[in-house]
Design a protein with these regions (language model features):
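General structural feature for long, well-ordered alpha-helical segments within catalytic domains
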Residues: 35, 46-49, 53, 66-77, ...
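Histidine/acidic-residue-rich, glycine-tolerant segments that coordinate divalent metal ions
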Residues: 94-95, 114-116, 122-132, 138-139, ...
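Metal-dependent amide/peptide-bond hydrolase catalytic core
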Residues: 17, 21-23, 31, 244-418
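Non-cysteine beta-strand/loop elements that form the S-adenosyl-L-methionine
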Residues: 106-108, 219, 376-382
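Extreme N-terminal basic, low-complexity initiation segments
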Residues: 2-10
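Divalent metal-coordination and catalytic microenvironments
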Residues: 57, 107, 137, 163, ...
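Acidic/His- and Gly-rich active-site-bordering loop/insert found
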Residues: 11-13, 17-133, 138, 142-145, ...
Length: 418
């Protein structure tokens, strides 16, 4: 496949990336081994399809809760394979069961794109102005679709599987919470997901026990005062002074009241107030985010923020309205689920398993893990050459060899399950 960080059209399938390598860490049963051989054969026959699917989805991105065409595309391929997909309430996203009845493993992919303009220059770049797949969800969807079709061709599976093609990951509090509310988790005992990581080279997959993402909440503080002349601040409530007090005071006091080992950080993203140098403004606004890697701390943040803000602003006389929007909890990888991921990753080769750190970003996969144990891993998508572009950049692209890696890992988790 592509040997650069861009998914070029010239010979995208130069060869399979993965050499399957059993070792002392990845012993498998004969049934699992034959299943893996069958998956390998399916991949050899369908690598072109994986690339074409990803490029089709990439060229036709859809924003959160509008993923109708993507849902129809996935549903059509699942139906063609003899499976029975069920579209989720709202008409975007779907679930599909494979394998025997009874307790199931859940595999999830998010489907939505971002509201930004793509500047990759690719022949299959977004055809929708202002909308782009810059977070790898086109790859996530393709990998889960490939996993579904590969597993569907096996005569039997050791465990039932529920595929969840999820809408609206990019908007808080995320589409996962609606998927859970719809009852789609009924019978699912464990959940797994992959997320593209441009910091890891293709062929490597990172995972860790414990928190791998952070909780992410949003604060909007609207302030109001009578306003006045800057020569007479004593006759009014100095709104700009009050804003400055909150800008420095809230992050500072949070850092003194919360254990630093929780990786809690409060950062302002936007501040606005006034226009004239000699007029104390009547209104102002601050917005920012609070992130933490600790689930217990997340539950304490909102009341603590409200208490601190009130204490900071009360002496100023400025009126305020605090809008605190809870986002998502951290994704906390459960031990056994992480070990299952690690075994599947090691089967790729001796250097495939990578260490990874906790991210400050939020991920709504965490809502599934509020219901059942599970784990998320980071799929390397960097070619190893050129610039490492970050997620959510308008020039972001990925090495398409990662599609095969993702299918191998997810199918292997299923085949090893008992």
């Amino acid at each position: 496949m592509s040997t650069t960080g861009r998914a070029r059209d010239t010979d995208p399938l130069a060869g399979s990336w993965v050499t399957m390598a059993d070792n002392e860490h990845s012993a498998v049963s004969n049934g699992s081994r034959s299943g893996r051989d069958a998956v390998g054969a399916w991949l050899s026959d369908h690598l072109v399809d994986l690339v074409q699917w990803r490029r089709h989805i990439h060229a036709n991105p859809e924003l959160s809760r509008t993923e109708f065409a993507t849902t129809e595309f996935v549903s059509a391929w699942l139906t063609k394979a003899g499976l029975i997909p069920q579209v989720l309430p709202g008409g975007t996203g779907l679930i599909c069961d494979i394998g025997p009845e009874g307790p199931r493993i859940g595999l999830r992919a998010d489907m939505d794109a971002l509201p930004l303009q793509e500047f990759t220059g690719l022949s299959f770049a977004s055809t929708v102005p202002g909308v782009a797949h810059a977070c790898g969800h086109d790859a996530h969807t393709t990998i889960l679709l490939g996993t579904a079709l590969a597993l569907a061709e096996l005569p039997q599976l050791p465990v039932g599987v529920r595929l969840i093609f999820q809408p609206a990951e990019e908007v808080m509090p995320g589409g996962a919470i609606d998927v859970v509310a719809s009852g789609a988790m009924a019978g699912v005992e464990r959940m797994f997901a992959l997320h593209c990581d441009p910091r890891l080279e293709v062929g490597r997959v990172g995972i860790r026990v414990g928190a791998i993402t952070s909780a992410a909440d949003t604060i909007e503080l609207v302030l109001d005062s009578p306003g006045g002349h800057t020569s007479r601040p004593h006759l009014t409530s100095d709104l700009v002074y009050a804003i400055g007090t909150v800008i420095t005071g809230l992050p500072g006091l949070l850092s003194r009241r919360i254990d630093p080992r929780t990786s809690t950080v409060m950062v302002w993203g936007a501040v606005s107030a006034g226009k004239a140098p000699n007029a104390i403004p009547q209104t102002g606004m601050l917005t920012g985010t609070i992130r933490t890697g600790d689930h217990e701390t997340w539950s304490l943040l909102e009341p603590m923020v409200r208490e601190i803000v009130d204490g900071l602003l009360a002496p100023t006389g400025v009126r305020y309205q605090l809008n605190y929007r809870r986002g998502v909890p951290p994704v906390v990888n459960e031990v056994q689920s992480t070990r299952m991921f690690e075994d599947a990753i090691r089967a790729l080769g001796p250097d495939a398993l990578a260490d990874t750190m906790q991210s400050g970003g939020g991920e709504d996969f965490s809502w599934y893990l509020e219901e059942v144990p599970g784990a998320m891993a980071r799929l390397g998508v960097w070619s190893g050459e050129g610039e490492q572009l970050d997620l959510h950049q308008p020039t972001f692209d990925l090495d398409e060899r990662a599609l095969e890696v993702g299918v191998r890992v997810l199918t292997d988790i299923v085949l090893r399950a008992r």
